[in-house]
Amino acid sequence: MVVAMAMANNGSLSPAPPAAFQEPPPDYTENGRLYHGLHKGKYMFPCDEDEKDRMDIFHKFFEVAMGGVLHSRNTTFTNNYDGPRILDLGTGTGIWAIDMADKYGSDMGTGEVLGLDLARIQPPTIPENLQFLQRDIESPWWGLEVESWDMVHIRMLSGSINSWPALYQKVRRYLKPQVGRFEQVEIDFTPRSDFGDIPADSALATWARNLFEATRRNFRPLAYNTEIRAMLQKEEFLDIQEEVIRIPLNPWPDDPQEKDVARWYNLALTQGLEAMTLGPMHRIYGWTKDDVTRLITEVRRDICNRKIRAYNNLHVWTARAPVKPPS
């Protein structure tokens, strides 16, 4: 069906998959958590029901943190008779893609949304203008049409990508020249405090250091990529903009909006600590599940302690495709 969409838009197709292309291997269990079988071990985070709940909580958090919108107000679409064509990379449970399909299927006629992810964890009942494919976004995008997407969306893929420059090059190639929009939303999990509330030997600081190093050794660092602007500039993206939003780890601020953001972030983070930590610590450092449980119990205590006035930063990047695609 993706190929049919491509032909309808007269785009040039990426090469077809090789004849030996096979169904991905089954998912597998490790330390009581379910992980996807496609490119086993490459992605360190689980894909079970608890993880799906975490992803959906994070979706609500992002919506609250961004002022109740599904995408940045900087991301606008040109008039398009058929509605915008939107590509969601690393779609997870597909909840953002579903909301976008509902919005642009009703608001703008026949907008189309396609979500790609390593794991098939999306619901079976979805809007008619939405499709999900099980794909590794770092591999060739078989059958997708180049220069034909109005928006490419990335959210929370730190820790999953080996080469950001290669991914940005693909994004540029598949966006409509000059009018296609790119949006990337990432959390910098570095614990910060303007009041000196985070000792270097605290559980929170120790957790972040160890997790950053473990994912770096896996060649897919969770640490925030500080070179995003330079990488987008190298691909000649236009109108590059960054919005930084402070996200408190618990409701310690006085501002009501920040308190609301903090409540959702605290829920998402405390719910997701095991999922974020278990795979990297076990596979890289050889920690047992009990080792991880002890650490994240202390980290939760720090995260929920209102005397620790800590926060992370949420980065929202937007850009417009260059006039000409790469040669």
Swiss-Prot record:
Its EC number is 2.1.1.-. Its main location: nucleus. InterPro entries: SAM-dependent_MTases_sf. Disruption phenotype: Impairs the ability to produce oxalic acid, to colonize the host tissue, and to form sclerotia. Gene3D superfamilies: Vaccinia Virus protein VP39 (3.40.50.150). Keywords: Methyltransferase, Nucleus, S-adenosyl-L-methionine, Sporulation, Transcription, Transcription regulation, Transferase, Virulence. It is found in: Nucleus. One of its GO terms (molecular function) is methyltransferase activity. It comes from the Eukaryota. It catalyses: L-methionyl-[protein] + S-adenosyl-L-methionine = S-methyl-L-methionyl-[protein] + S-adenosyl-L-homocysteine. It is an enzyme of class 2 (transferase). GO terms for biological process: methylation; sporulation resulting in formation of a cellular spore. GO terms for cellular component: nucleus. Pfam families: Methyltransf_23. Methyltransferase that performs automethylation. No other methyl-accepting substrate has been identified yet. Component of the velvet transcription factor complex that acts as a global regulator for secondary metabolite gene expression. Controls the expression of the oxalic acid gene cluster. Also controls the expression of proteases and carbohydrate-active enzymes. Regulates sclerotia formation and plays a role in virulence. Component of the heterotrimeric velvet complex composed of LAE1, VEL1 and VEL2; VEL1 acting as a bridging protein between LAE1 and VEL2. Belongs to the methyltransferase superfamily. LaeA methyltransferase family. This is Secondary metabolism regulator LAE1. It comes from Botryotinia fuckeliana (strain B05.10). The lineage of its organism: Eukaryota, Fungi, Dikarya, Ascomycota, Pezizomycotina. The gene is LAE1.
